[in-house]
């Protein structure tokens, strides 16, 4: 009988937006995915290098780096991660998957990763809705997002232990749930609490609609702005659990989730 490796998510940082980023009330570090020997980092914002090493998750072990859009709370440590992933630029290895805004710049946004750094990785993939790509043992599909960077994407992640969804930054819109059906876990970037409408980010009201429509096995809220932190992410998560009957947790910095 074959034993499948665990899928591990290290949610190293749970902060989002410029005010939380600049105050570091919560870290803006992103998520490390590990399965067997494969490691991929998603959205390495400010502090990603420091706190990855602090958590003993060396960026030198990365097989892939994903940047879902061109805002600094998602991209600032990407270049130093590339230098680590390429063994100090000595080995042309690893996958860099990022949006047009990150790689080339568009509509006054970006680029945020230099051509030099793009040139030293093993493979560069420009991602937009529908693009499917691999990094080690993971298969990713870029999903639709509606955000102030018009090239933003979310992710659907195929693992040895089922599918994971990561919305990245997006407002709720009709049809969003179509990308996030049949999930073991949905990770929702939820910037604002109930009663605080915002079109370009998710709030708790939008999260409720998405969870009810997508029906994942479980959800984790992350990427909190100041208003969410002041309201209490744990209270918002409990409200969503009560309303949907689906387990919903509010992430904390350094949280580890294992799926088997």
Regions found by a protein language model. Give the residues of each.
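Active-site neighborhood of phospho(di)ester-bond hydrolases with catalytic His/Asp-centered motifs
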Residues: 41-45, 63-73, 99, 165-170, ...
């Amino acid at each position: 009988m074959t034993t499948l490796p665990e899928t591990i998510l290290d949610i190293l940082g749970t902060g989002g937006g410029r005010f939380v980023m600049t105050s570091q009330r919560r870290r803006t570090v992103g998520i490390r995915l590990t399965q067997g020997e494969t490691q991929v980092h998603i959205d390495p914002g400010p502090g990603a290098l420091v706190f990855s090493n602090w958590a003993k998750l060396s960026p030198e072990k990365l097989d892939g780096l994903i940047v879902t859009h061109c805002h600094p709370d998602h991209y600032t440590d990407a270049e130093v991660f590339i230098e680590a992933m390429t063994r100090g630029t000595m080995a042309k290895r690893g996958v860099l998957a990022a949006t047009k805004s990150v790689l080339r710049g568009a509509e006054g946004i970006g680029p945020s990763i230099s051509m030099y750094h793009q040139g030293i990785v093993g493979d560069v993939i420009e991602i937009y809705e529908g693009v499917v790509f691999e990094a080690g043992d993971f298969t990713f599909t870029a999903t639709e997002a509606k955000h102030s960077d018009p090239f933003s994407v979310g992710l659907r992640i195929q693992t040895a232990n089922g599918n994971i969804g990561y919305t990245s930054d997006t407002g709720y819109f009709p049809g969003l749930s179509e990308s996030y059906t049949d999930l073991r876990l949905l990770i929702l970037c939820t910037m604002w609490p109930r009663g605080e409408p915002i079109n370009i980010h998710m709030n708790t009201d939008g999260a409720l609609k998405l969870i009810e429509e997508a029906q994942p096995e479980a959800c984790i809220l992350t990427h909190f702005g100041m208003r969410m932190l002041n309201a209490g992410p744990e209270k918002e998560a409990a409200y969503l659990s009560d309303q949907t009957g689906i387990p919903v947790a509010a992430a904390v910095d350094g949280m580890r989730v294992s799926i088997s």
